[in-house]
Amino acid sequence: MALLSRIRSSTSLFRHLNASPQIRSLSSASTILSPDSKTPLTSKEKSKAALSLLKSEKDPDRILEICRAASLTPDCRIDRIAFSAAVENLAEKKHFSAVSNLLDGFIENRPDLKSERFAAHAIVLYAQANMLDHSLRVFRDLEKFEISRTVKSLNALLFACLVAKDYKEAKRVYIEMPKMYGIEPDLETYNRMIKVFCESGSASSSYSIVAEMERKGIKPNSSSFGLMISGFYAEDKSDEVGKVLAMMKDRGVNIGVSTYNIRIQSLCKRKKSKEAKALLDGMLSAGMKPNTVTYSHLIHGFCNEDDFEEAKKLFKIMVNRGCKPDSECYFTLIYYLCKGGDFETALSLCKESMEKNWVPSFSIMKSLVNGLAKDSKVEEAKELIGQVKEKFTRNVELWNEVEAALPQ
């Protein structure tokens, strides 16, 4: 699951890096990554600079140049995100040959990247670029690259199928590849397959995966059962959720906060936030301590059902109980409050968020500014624009246009 969280976290990290004065001061690829610079950057500074550039660079040759100059490596989290940004950028513009040049070129020409770890990362990145056939090719050609093939690359290939949402191919890989290459599936392999069945609307098939795991002496963990719970909720099979919870108890698997969070999120996705709130009350009655994730799911759920008062109430309760809202919680609530016309509360939360150096996206901020102006709070709107321009110098012209359109 770690690879998925890395990819999903890239958008949030981009936002924080763009707000950094250090990154804003870096002007171009030639000065950022030049080896002849009088003040050479550290490896970490190069990675941050590369990530900032890769977001917006349009020339495929320049994207490859930036990646090579930064000497990116999968050992570093920010480098993994930079790789993902480069591939995503190239794929969006349909520069698929450039994606191959980047990933295959690194495996073939960088001795430090001739490893199963980078190959596994490349397998997933190809799927991210909608090039699953290349993911399969890399897996098959590992010997050609003089890279050993273990369960790690098998799991990466299954994850690539999940990224591509090619569930039929995932099932084929699971059935054929372990036998073909003499690979013994592990816990992660089985959890990947549970996710495949649950995402493809066949959550009941996950029972057979659990049975196979146990036949081979591998114990399902809370993640295994959590995936099943999420899958059954998505299919509106609450009775099956009860069965899974009973299985957890029978096997001594703790039903902790993470399991409750999965249940709460699943119910909120199905617009059953009141039912999810009842689970929160049950947690508190049982002496369990909900965390930031618990409240964030509920806040998002009630916002999505246009119950903004309950969402605001939960936000206050969350803070009062010592749970610190993260940036996404702020952004979600600000977005929905603007949508619901509560610009005063949205402004207050926006100021809190910006004090923590968390600035919502341009579209959210523009919605808030225009809403304040409609509420005859033009000065507050202009003040907010001024603060945002300090954080995002690259958007100054856009904000000047927004400000010029405000009532005078």
Swiss-Prot record:
Cellular compartments annotated: Mitochondrion inner membrane
GO molecular function: nucleotide binding; RNA binding
Pfam families: PPR, PPR_2
GO cellular component term of the entry, any: mitochondrial inner membrane
Main location: mitochondrion
Boundaries of the annotated transit peptide in chain numbering: 1-26
Record's keyword annotation contains Isomerase: no
PPR repeat residues: 115-149, 150-185, 186-220, 221-255, 256-290, 291-325, 326-360, 361-391
Presence of the UniProt keyword Transit peptide in the record: yes
Disulfide bonds: none
Record InterPro entries: Pentatricopeptide_rpt, PPR-containing_protein, TPR-like_helical_dom_sf
NCBIfam families: PPR
Similarity-based family: Belongs to the PPR family. P subfamily.
Record's function text: May be involved in translation through its association with polysomes. Could bind RNA.
Record's protein name: Small ribosomal subunit protein mS86 (rPPR1)
Species the sequence originates in: Arabidopsis thaliana (Mouse-ear cress)
Organismal lineage: Eukaryota, Viridiplantae, Streptophyta, Embryophyta, Tracheophyta
